[in-house]
């Protein structure tokens, strides 16, 4: 190799610090094709260094690399560190990958960490309908009724997307279905906002039925009138008008009250121990 070529390569090599190269290697941006994470760390790369808005651990979660996540944690990465967006690695993992979530939780990640908008990892797992991440977070102590800056809960986030699987799990863990955010919206009204766009699927219809069973009774009208967006869809408007006009029955209201009285726990286990007929247990668990 000529001296000029060697000089050029040395200049390129020195352009990036070891820590910058670590980020690029994790993200598979191969500026140096022969770099690997373990060698870079062994060579002195800082596993907690921030480049731009990124930290190595957060980056590994973005690309769903659970092995890399564990390696970084073994080498001293701070599990609850915040990146440039005030998010923890668990916020990113919750959106994408259960394996990364499990590793982070094993190393002490805070399941109730707040980002800059007061969103928890559970909010993001529910929004992305990553049902296994939702379950893993709840099993590790995530607050099922955590409030973001708008007083929306993970259930509200799941409902606004019609995420049936996540809604079902959250309800199993006692999520409050009548919570009202700062704009006066409830989980079921967030779902209705999706349905009125004409984008409803069979799964979203099932999500609506599940939320309706859980809430017992709901009201969308103001001064007896449906919102203008709902009124544009005659068929949906008629259906919702009937549901809103019908008073909650003693049976449905009792179901809501009993479920709420059981508190924040895994309701299928709690209901199983109640001295009730099997049919009533199924009713309490919203199985119809």
UniProtKB/Swiss-Prot annotation:
Cellular component annotations (GO), alphabetically ordered: cytoplasm
An example Gene Ontology biological process: protein ubiquitination
Matching CDD domains: SOCS_ASB8
Modification(s) after translation: Phosphorylated by TBK1.
Keywords, alphabetical: ANK repeat, Cytoplasm, Phosphoprotein, Repeat, Ubl conjugation pathway
Phosphoserine sites (modified residues): 17
Predominant localisation class: cytoplasm
InterPro entries named in the record: Ankyrin_rpt, Ankyrin_rpt-contain_sf, ASB8_SOCS, SOCS_box, SOCS_box-like_dom_sf
Keyword Heme: no
ANK repeat locations: 52-81, 85-113, 117-146, 150-179
Domain SOCS box residue range list: 235-288
Pathway membership: Protein modification; protein ubiquitination
Pfam family, one: Ank_2
PROSITE patterns: ANK_REP_REGION (PS50297), ANK_REPEAT (PS50088), SOCS (PS50225)
Record note on quaternary structure: Interacts with TBK1; this interaction promotes TBK1 proteasomal degradation.
Family, per entry: Belongs to the ankyrin SOCS box (ASB) family.
Function description: May be a substrate-recognition component of a SCF-like ECS (Elongin-Cullin-SOCS-box protein) E3 ubiquitin-protein ligase complex which mediates the ubiquitination and subsequent proteasomal degradation of target proteins. Inhibits IFN-beta production through the IRF3 signaling pathway by targeting TBK1 via 'Lys-48'-linked ubiquitination, leading to its proteasomal degradation.
Domain characteristics, as noted in the entry: The SOCS box domain mediates the interaction with the Elongin BC complex, an adapter module in different E3 ubiquitin-protein ligase complexes.
Protein name in UniProt: Ankyrin repeat and SOCS box protein 8
Organism: Bos taurus (Bovine)
